[in-house]
């Protein structure tokens, strides 16, 4: 590999996120529905390095070039496979940091998939997903990058049918950052353990499209603790609902909030309202 290879990594929203328990090893069990989005996105420009190992550079402050999801993914793959190619990675961030969109997890998955594609002895998808789960709960999903239900610590991935074609998803990213580690700590401190049986989305089919409503199945265990510290995010969610969204929810541990609109014109009106308030807004026709 002599020429630069540019890896594009997108992001996700959690259309449902239950933190079901905390294990003795510190990992959290989840039950979540992931939807991949192609915008916003990051780029990883990969070139050949001078010696075995990986070097990461990034112009964004707050990202440790020696210890991040990209280096952790490389180290995990190298340990499992013995394959240690010399790589330089320039990380060009487009996904907002601390937004609950899984940008760092997508970066890790991009490197894992890249290493798998160039390794003389690939590890296979199952092993790759196990490695991915050690890096973060979102990483196995990004290995697949299709609508999925994730359980366990994120390593149990089941593709699902997405029934709401024609809906418009509006993603709002305010100038707020929420640390995932802080959010989990706050959740543990609140001792919130919510378990419920869900039948709306399954691997074989879905509930009647007409049964979709604001509160029918969307849930995020992080919302109570994050909204308590960042009430402006609750206000953002409520504003989206007032603009005619069929549903709105914080993604991941925040701070981004997304909404689903049945009518494209309602989404466009909300888009115009929000973009003038120092909020990055993206539209996706599903």
From Swiss-Prot:
Pfam family, one: GHMP_kinases_N
Keyword Ion transport on entry: no
Pathway: Isoprenoid biosynthesis; isopentenyl diphosphate biosynthesis via DXP pathway; isopentenyl diphosphate from 1-deoxy-D-xylulose 5-phosphate: step 3/6
Catalytic site positions: 12, 138
One GO biological process term: isopentenyl diphosphate biosynthetic process, methylerythritol 4-phosphate pathway
UniProt EC number: 2.7.1.148
Entries under PANTHER family matching the protein: 4-DIPHOSPHOCYTIDYL-2-C-METHYL-D-ERYTHRITOL KINASE, CHLOROPLASTIC
Protein family: Belongs to the GHMP kinase family. IspE subfamily.
Name assigned to this protein: 4-diphosphocytidyl-2-C-methyl-D-erythritol kinase
